[in-house]
Amino acid sequence: MTRRTSIERYRNIGISAHIDAGKTTTTERILFYTGITHKLGEVHEGAATMDWMEQEQERGITITSAATTAFWRGMAGNYPEHRINIIDTPGHVDFTIEVERSMRVLDGACMVYDSVGGVQPQSETVWRQANKYGVPRIAFVNKMDRVGADFFRVQRQIVERLKGDAVPIQIPVGAEDHFEGVVDLVKMKAIIWDDASQGVRFEYRDIPPELQAQAEQWREKMIEKAAEANEALLEKYLSGQPLSEDEIKSGLRARTVANEIVPMLCGSAFKNKGVQAMLDAVIDYLPSPADVPAIIGHDERDREIERHPADDEPFSALAFKIMTDPFVGQLVFFRVYSGVVKSGDSVLNPLKSKKERLGRILQMHANERREISEVYAGDIAAAVGIKEITTGDTLTDPAHVIILERMTFPEPVISQAVEPRTKADQEKMGIALNRLAQEDPSFRVRTDEESGQTIISGMGELHLEILVDRMKREFGVEANVGKPQVAYRETIRSTVTDVEGKFVKQSGGRGQYGHVVLKLEPQEQGKGYEFVDAIKGGVVPREFIPAVDRGVRETLNTGVLAGYPVVDVKVTLVFGSYHDVDSNENAFRMAASMAFKEGMRRAKPVLLEPMMHVEVETPEDFTGNVMGDLSSRRGMVQGMEDIAGGGGKLVRAEVPLAEMFGYSTSLRSLTQGRATYSMEFKHYAEAPRQVAEQIIAARGSGAAARG
């Protein structure tokens, strides 16, 4: 089987947006116009093709990023066939891990904005993630038919808030109820879509006279941006010669691919206007796998190597999503960066040092699947039959090993105890939780050693709620869930030296002897734990030094204040002694543990609590109530601004997570259900003394017993 589409005609794109900007509807229209779905799925009827998990349909929000393949020949049928792989990404803050994960494997993104709401809190998070992975993007201002729609305001917000160089390549014809179509600034023609054919047919018309001056003004700005792509275009532009349509497009393309500009389009996906032209813009301006730099990884000796997006290079791919499918079991979604792989081939997972046989390879369309025999560089597909794999692992040709950069995942900030209702549920729950943790690296499962309870941790209340819900639906596990618990941390504030730990047992026969002297220092936030060996003259033999490190590491899990994990400390092994016969690894491990506990007590230990960045959008009448309530939750209000279009106020604050439980219910009653909020983890901060004392007292007996 040979390649159906050359790699230059591939587009791997993500569609990202703030919740409710109409992203799922936009994706639906793409599937419709590219000829895959024949009835348009509407989100508000719970029937969208991409939202394929039951909870998504009920909640009307997209949770799992499904990958879909579509083909496009241009809205006027004037392009060779292009293959567009779309990764649908969630717009809810609790699911940013999904967005981060898909950004890693995309070549380009289409950012969808609501014409009224504009740039919203989640849009900023998604933008930062796209910057982190260097993903070129175009912007689509959706819902132009809404009351208060303002395309140019969104353009200003992208420039001011996101610091993106937003370049309109279209302007709207009308707005709100009178939104009819767009002016294509490259062709200088109006595009009007036909309602009767659900937007499949369209016609070019002359620009309405009242828009002519505005169109010329924005076209001039666009041409200036395009001309800056290279010397030849700039020279031609500066000498006053007109640039051709192809020259404008190639200039805009070069600057978009280089992440210098963001072409902007508009439309109303719901009213079947604009999505078709946005698909053309994906082809015109977003990169193919061949336009982005080669992927860099490391070989087994940790030397840097690269792979180019070509079929004749050795096979390399990244597993970016793992899902359990009710029909075929575990599905591993992967992006092929180089080479070709056939079903039945063996590939190596170098991070697990394990060879895996690819059973079947499936190409997905939402939750429909087509079996294919091989995949090529640039493809996105799903494999069945891979046993041991975690999100972010590399799959590679066993004869030419490469380890691609691992993704980084945030630490969970909220925990809950979860208990099976019956004995039968108990066994199923273990299997279900392990499956879910394998699919979602921001979800953790552990057993509390004291209480024996199973503790689940995640990125927010909604995140855990949905995972418990999935346990019930997909695995038939009925479980009771405890009150959410905050993931506190402990650290130290001062340096202590000469902290001694001695573990000696000599009672006939072979004894135990380990003796260490440690120095403890606070590290800057986020630096984590660091161990330094400063032993001179072999007073502690080489072979016992890893045991000292291990002893400290094990003790980090339970701090001395309230038994929470310890972060951001530097431990230096400065001195010690040993016994020729009685010393062993275990003795040094115990000595290090004793020394660390003692040192921590002396180093001014403090309790840290997670602080959340909270944004509340509220009608103006309730602003005082909202701010007062946030302050009563120990929140620091950091700013307030008008929501464009007379839509009330946006209040930004930093609030401890411990004070935010059940906030959605309180906010509803404070504002008669008219305010919305979003929240994401910001950083850890020292808890005030009286708060810390309460937490320590509540955990006191346990911590005292542990100490």
Curated annotation (Swiss-Prot):
Cytoplasm among keywords: yes
Protein's organism: Bordetella bronchiseptica (strain ATCC BAA-588 / NCTC 13252 / RB50) (Alcaligenes bronchisepticus)
Domain tr-type G: 8-290
InterPro entries in alphabetical order: EFG_II, EFG_III, EFG_III/V, EFG_IV, EFG_V, EFG_V-like, EFTu-like_2, G_TR_CS
GO molecular function: GTP binding; GTPase activity; guanosine tetraphosphate binding; translation elongation factor activity
Protein family per UniProt: Belongs to the TRAFAC class translation factor GTPase superfamily. Classic translation factor GTPase family. EF-G/EF-2 subfamily.
Protein name per its UniProtKB record: Elongation factor G 2
Gene for this chain: fusA2
GO biological process: ribosome disassembly
Keywords per UniProt: Cytoplasm, Elongation factor, GTP-binding, Nucleotide-binding, Protein biosynthesis
